[in-house]
């Protein structure tokens, strides 16, 4: 029997389809059964949808974006560091359980249940001797950062999702190199995907001066990174153990308003005081999870006695990610919203939370709480942008006021309630930040800071458009289609 070329193609196509079917079947089994404890039901269904619609392409996407790193791979070499803070956490938990909150601060007493919940995290010990300044403009922020680097005496630790070596990045790198020449310890931890244009070779001069650099989840293969799903989205600076920074600004010219999105509106905190110990602890834990050289452990020089009374702003630092036992920041946000009596002000560039978070916001609004949500008017990630808008209908119907920021790009991640307390940090209000990425937020029980940030929010409203039920209902059919498609896959964005 003679075989034609078309017969061969048909046979080959059949074999490819069979292989694709088997791969999809195996992958579906893995997603449903083997990873059920590390994946939500909505995420499971979203991945099954992708595999069904895009059989072979879906498999490739899963290799890059679907796998979650086991916690045991991230918690190595940290026993000694954690042990030194276990006693403090245990003591505070026991005191709170007895109704002894250890402070006269009214907001800590009022929100003692939130404080108690955050104490369940290894970074979450409560500190009160703190002074907090806030920044909403990148130029102001990095002018202060560069001044603080210049004034450093012993060491500087930086941990960033994006460390772009453009104009701003070079200024910071040169400032750090000057401190190395003065004999200071300087360490940089950057995310390999968030800083994708950065190569380790870019730091050769920095390292020749004694600086240390690590890339978080660096790929061993060029152009291929199979750990893209779990990224270090944290932004932390610690200087001399006396002051620290945490918030939404990355390092790069874009965050000074020089990118295609225009003015960059974000929120960042500068903290002086005991809460810096928690930021230092977080940096050490993250560094130790990636470092190829000998680890560094608890040392009094990294947790020094602070320079006298600094302020009275109680702070807890909360970190979450694949290595965490539970979703600390998401639950912190949710607890704040559910405890609000008067007002809630939310800002997030990506708003794709799960139903429980959406329901908390709806319940607050239906209970008479004045709830505000601010999101971007322009996309930096189109699919995420449409998924964000897909949640608007339910929220508007519940009485939530939604604003689209028109004066550039809103990148701030903030939850503020009752002009009493606020959470600021790196966590967006979406599935990726709540479950997949490594994030860090400060929960600050400070009326002055809360009121200052509410004033900034009200100024942002003057630069925004309010989204109404009428305008949302009249959006084009093409927009409705994009939102529906984005909503289907939103749990895996």
Locations of regions flagged by a protein language model:
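N-terminal localization/anchoring segments of enzymes in phospholipid and broader phosphate metabolism
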Residues: 1-331, 335, 339, 379, ...
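Helical hairpin unit composed of two closely spaced alpha helices linked by a short loop
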Residues: 340, 350-372, 376, 381
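Short alpha-helical functional segments enriched in proximate histidine and acidic residues
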Residues: 347
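Histidine/acidic-residue-rich catalytic or RNA/ligand-binding cores of hydrolases
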Residues: 356-358, 385-387, 417
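Short, solvent-exposed amphipathic alpha-helical segments in soluble enzyme
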Residues: 360-364, 390, 459
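Active-site donor-binding acidic/aromatic loop of nucleotide-activated sugar
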Residues: 402-406
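Catalytic-core elements of nucleic-acid end-processing and repair enzymes
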Residues: 413
